[in-house]
A protein has these predicted regions:
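Bacterial Sec-dependent N-terminal signal peptides
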Residues: 1-22
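Pepsin/retropepsin-fold aspartyl endopeptidases
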Residues: 17-303
Length: 303
């Protein structure tokens, strides 16, 4: 009987839509020296499992990393080995144990770090979602001195020293200020007519809203409502409501309908003081060029 129930559950999980959100919050750690060898770097990326995968090297070994603005810094895969939990971290589905590791040398394009602290997690479920080996995640502590351009039409990431003139790029369609909530860039917008604070998370394969907004957004502004599975870095699939929402508005710019999943973000608010209403993930980034300038604390969008 248990085998039958297990088979039914497995079949159900294959049929229902599944989403990965590689969001992680931990307390800030000490960082190493950063060397900027030039003013500009261009890095190709692959979209796998709804996430941005780039090539980087750690301690002389090159491999696949998820470029994740929802991650605090360098997060390395624990390779299924047990590790000593150094502290607690927060994800979209709850609290998880996080290990600590010394990264002797890290290289991503022009970005070079030495002797910096990284986080340690088992990311095997992300490997399954992406269909490839994943060495870890790259987040805020690596990116914070730069303007990072997500050029989806050309499948490339461009990294500039913050404040460098981008003379070859056209004037952006939209420029927005952002504030940092922990390590996450947060902008103000409206979703389904409701004013919300949205974190920009390039490690999320789907947009996320706190579940209270499912009822706050009028039914007329929601369509294709279904139950779907949402998995955070704690690797616990959570069944949530999902819907296409007619309008996401940033200032006077209205974006096309996008899909959102609705889940309880109370863990982030209550335990880590991350007061956000949701996350804009890959559905927001794709089909356009989006730049996050950490130095100027501005987001630029080209459509």
């Amino acid at each position: 009987m248990k085998k039958v129930l297990g088979l039914l559950l497995f079949t159900y999980q294959l049929l229902i839509a599944q989403h990965q959100v590689a969001f992680l919050h931990v307390e800030p750690q000490a960082t190493g020296m950063v060397a900027m060898s030039s003013a500009f770097s261009e890095i190709p990326f692959e979209l796998a499992g709804g996430m941005i995968v780039v090539q980087a090297s750690v301690n002389g070994e090159t491999g696949n990393f998820i470029l994740d603005t929802g991650a605090p810094g360098i997060v390395l895969d624990a390779k299924n080995d047990a590790f000593v939990a150094s502290y607690k971290g927060g994800s979209v589905n709850g609290i998880l144990n996080v290990g600590q590791v010394l990264v002797k040398d890290f290289q991503l394009g022009i970005i070079h770090e030495e002797k910096t602290q990284g986080n340690l997690l088992d990311v095997h479920h992300l490997e399954l979602a992406c269909g490839m080996d994943i060495m870890g995640l790259i987040g805020y502590e690596v990116l914070k001195g730069y303007e990072v351009v997500f050029d989806f039409p050309n499948h490339r990431i461009q990294a500039f020293k913050s404040g460098t003139t981008r003379s070859s790029m056209q004037k952006p369609t939209l420029a927005l200020p952002f504030m940092l909530c922990g390590h996450v860039p947060v902008i103000v917008g409206k979703v389904g007519g409701k004013r919300v604070f949205l974190g920009l998370d390039s490690g999320a394969s789907v947009n996320v809203l706190d579940r209270k907004y499912f009822k706050k957004i009028k039914a007329a502004n929601r369509s294709n409502v279904k139950q779907e599975l949402l998995t955070g870095l704690e690797n616990t699939p959570n069944q949530v409501m999902a819907a296409d929402v007619t309008e996401t508005r940033l200032r006077s710019t209205s974006l096309p309908p996008m899909r959102y999943v609705f889940t309880d973000l109370g863990c982030l608010r209550d335990n880590f003081d991350i007061a956000i209403d949701g996350l804009l993930g890959i559905p927001f980034f794709k089909d356009k060029v989006v730049s996050i300038d950490y130095g100027q604390k501005k987001v630029f969008i080209w459509e």
